């Protein structure tokens, strides 16, 4: 590793979820505070960090492919520092070093804020593995944000659920909620820098506060996601607040009412349902029924009729019959989601479902995924149709990389929208502006339109 006065450049590749993206921003901030600068290309970097995901096997295999390329590079460039962070690192630990001996540092997601300390150990000539359970300290790190308009703020780490297909609890640890004032302080700092939108993040965000002490006079927990939203809503300068990812088991009417009543809360909800069949949900150990999920959606649409809904779903779970799969298709059509992230079941290490003997063959997985993706796209296109001819408030996030004359941004309902950077009065719009856009054209997953004079 290079001496501190000659740190050189770094490159971070992020796989997986929004939590990983937020972790990568923090680690980039640490590296830049140490004197590193971002490289112009991965193969030019003096330090390469892969922040990894193990939710699905294909993401994990992609990491090993990337590592093989960098390991070969390190054999001719011993000054290269090679780091694997995130969930694959946590899952594999020291076995990663045996598989890729060129690695300098293997670190689980709970150790993201310790990157400088761990690299100092690498400086001293050690190969370092940091995967032990660790209490996550407050986010005192100044993150290097990928956007100057929209930011992530972690509010709870880890997950206490035990879904039979999911590896997250074993790699991200138990739930650890941050204190409300610390979260608000971070949001105030971002707003002071000009950020307009914050997404509050948690693997299971509506479980926020379960591990914090305190009971209200009414007998409920003192700290909940609903209370947190009320606490941070008055941050000056912020225009929008979102949160993800929700679990139906903890999604309450009180939370829905807060989203409807607090003006900065966006009318977009990401609530995975995973299956439209109760027996499959029971086998997954999800802890709710299809009927409960429907009640949540009905309540959201009662309070916010135009709210957008997105979800995650798994097809070809072990033992899933054709009839059970058809119930999932029916639920998607019934609810009319704006977007659904789909996946065929992938056995993951250290999960109960991976050991069951009723795994479905690959051809069924491929066919069910193909069919459900076609349905999801059709539903998305139909849902997007309601925007045609409407005027929507769009937060401009930056230039359309495919057309520099356009800006791109999102509606409050999270619809990606493209529009001219120049208004009818020759006004030039820029990132951070809230623009009223007349929607001229709709596609399955995006909108385009014309900015109106404000």
UniProtKB/Swiss-Prot annotation:
It is found in: Cytoplasm. It catalyses: N(6)-dimethylallyladenosine(37) in tRNA + (sulfur carrier)-SH + AH2 + 2 S-adenosyl-L-methionine = 2-methylsulfanyl-N(6)-dimethylallyladenosine(37) in tRNA + (sulfur carrier)-H + 5'-deoxyadenosine + L-methionine + A + S-adenosyl-L-homocysteine + 2 H(+). Residues 145-382 form the Radical SAM core domain. One of its GO terms (cellular component) is cytoplasm. Its cofactor is [4Fe-4S] cluster. Keywords: 4Fe-4S, Cytoplasm, Iron, Iron-sulfur, Metal-binding, S-adenosyl-L-methionine, Transferase, tRNA processing. One of its GO terms (biological process) is tRNA methylthiolation. InterPro entries: Elp3/MiaA/NifB-like_rSAM (IPR006638), Methylthiotransferase (IPR005839), Methylthiotransferase_CS (IPR020612), Methylthiotransferase_N (IPR013848), Methylthiotransferase_N_sf (IPR038135), MiaB_methiolase (IPR006463), rSAM (IPR007197), rSAM_horseshoe (IPR023404). [4Fe-4S] cluster 1 binds at residues 17, 53, 87. Residues 8-124 form the MTTase N-terminal domain. Residues 385-453 form the TRAM domain. It comes from the Bacteria. Its EC number is 2.8.4.3. Its main location: cytoplasm. One of its GO terms (molecular function) is methylthiotransferase activity. The keyword tRNA processing applies. [4Fe-4S] cluster 2 binds at residues 159, 163, 166. Monomer. PANTHER family: CDK5 REGULATORY SUBUNIT-ASSOCIATED PROTEIN 1, MITOCHONDRIAL TRNA METHYLTHIOTRANSFERASE CDK5RAP1. Belongs to the methylthiotransferase family. MiaB subfamily. Catalyzes the methylthiolation of N6-(dimethylallyl)adenosine (i(6)A), leading to the formation of 2-methylthio-N6-(dimethylallyl)adenosine (ms(2)i(6)A) at position 37 in tRNAs that read codons beginning with uridine. This is tRNA-2-methylthio-N(6)-dimethylallyladenosine synthase. It comes from Synechococcus sp. (strain WH7803).
